[in-house]
């Protein structure tokens, strides 16, 4: 397959570049439409009690979405403010698609006790199509923002479909800013690596293809499932980072090949045959790591896993087709690598020899140190999060802060909703209804009764969680179901706990098979997984320490929220594990190549690290720059994911790959490459091998006359 791709790219480079040009137009033209289709992060898990109950209620009483406005003033009872608000309420009731707008002055609980704020709730009609709903939301928001006057100090509007629209606009701005920050820095680093603009510019072209692929993949998935506002940032930063990494690996190999092969086309073929296989397996390992997300029956996690996997495939194809085509056309102008193999990477060779010579000491220091950093993971907690996760400049966050400042805890939080199906006995209904004060009752068609219990605080707080568990304990065998945000979180946490072992088994099995196919060893995959888990645990522990416990949160613009976003841990684990496999394959490819050439196991470790250390370090720095740029947006989940991935790649590329890998390889010795005879025969037949670089082929001799 790789030889076919190489031939196509070298024989028809202009055609390949034209096809990728059309792909870029499609990605940046059609794909950017995804920013208008983003939603806030909802942990729906099909088949769970909370989701089944919510769907049952929607079928009986298809209520429309709602938006909320908070009006702040020195005194909302001021006649001028009252007149402005009531004028706006009257206007809102005339908006097409609006079902209900209660008078805040006549509705209990909507005027703050301090008299300095009030809430205006706008409920839309159910069953509106997308265009009608968007028009109604925009019109209603404009009329709420129209509440002004000298006595009004501020109006904040958000919620429902407006929240998704606001987050989409902010996400688009953040992605643009992150690209403007990261691309110039990446270019500077590539200039340092390659010493010339021609070579440095090619990875950026591949990166642009990765970004277009991210937009297009998400736009496609947005037509079949909800796409979280955080998905666009995660996929874009990963698409950009991996594209640069893969292009870097290919370009470094191309320059090495050009050192002894004058023919550009031949050098491209040998680059694809050697480094291309590493890129292919790297992409597959990242995709397998993300396959673990498909085990979770969560629409969000599955759509995220599929979207990111699609982006990885686009990056991989761009590195294997677009870059070879570009090298065919412009590679002759790129100077070959200057240093000889025995001269390059001396620092990494010294590190490898030190770690191999002091392997027991290195393991005795590095492993406990990483375990200590990972300790906070044992107390990790996740929650739904609230508007505190949003940047303070977003209107949704400003609305949240206004409610927090003027109203009692729990105001504006969705209640714990209890669905009493037909057949529920009166005694059970009475016991549940008496749990919390302020319970409201609604009767729906078909004999269903709904109890709405005040959550008593944030939907992801301990009071709401305890309330859900108490209701479920009290119902016995009665046909009673609990839904609402708090119940969704309880079910989501339980789903993660139930499916996490299966997800881990899926990922580890897939990784083991791929690494065995790549190396022919059964011990190397086990060693790789063990060392990768150390770096992953340390990175996740640091994220918990910063964001959950609140240490050092200020310098990076975060807040100690007492828990991580429910999206952060699974995404950090899946993506970081795949990225770590990337670096492992970069190093193992060089080690195996040196071992097959020399037969010396220990020297192969040194040579492998010497030849790959610079690439791995540069790749980690480039990814860290990209992840860091996306952390400037201020979304707390993105800050958590960005910090986790940045630390994971830096720890993995330094402590793990530069110290633990040579130390463990030296400890295993020749047994590192061991496999039972049946598996060894299977690998000889079905395994994957790279073509090692060698001298340029001799020129053809003229035919005898």
Curated annotation (Swiss-Prot):
The answer to whether UniProt assigns keyword Ion transport to this entry is no
Q: Which GO terms describe its cellular component?
A: plasma membrane
User: Which SUPFAM superfamilies does the record associate with it?
Assistant: Multidrug efflux transporter AcrB transmembrane domain (SSF82866)
Q: Which UniProt keywords apply?
A: Cell membrane, Membrane, Transmembrane, Transmembrane helix
Membrane topology annotation: Multi-pass membrane protein
Residue ranges spanning the membrane: these are 16-36, 144-164, 177-197, 201-221, 232-252, 280-300, 306-326, 360-380, 504-524, 528-548, 561-581, 615-635, 636-656
* Pfam families per UniProt: MMPL (PF03176)
Say if the entry is tagged with keyword Transcription regulation: no
Q: Which InterPro entries match?
A: MMPL_dom, Mycobact_MmpL, SSD
Annotated localization: Cell membrane
> Where is it chiefly localized?
membrane
For this chain, the family text in UniProt reads:
Belongs to the resistance-nodulation-cell division (RND) (TC 2.A.6) family. MmpL subfamily.
| PANTHER family in UniProt | MEMBRANE PROTEIN MJ1562-RELATED, MEMBRANE PROTEIN SCO6666-RELATED
Would you tell me the protein name for this molecule?
Putative membrane protein SCO6666
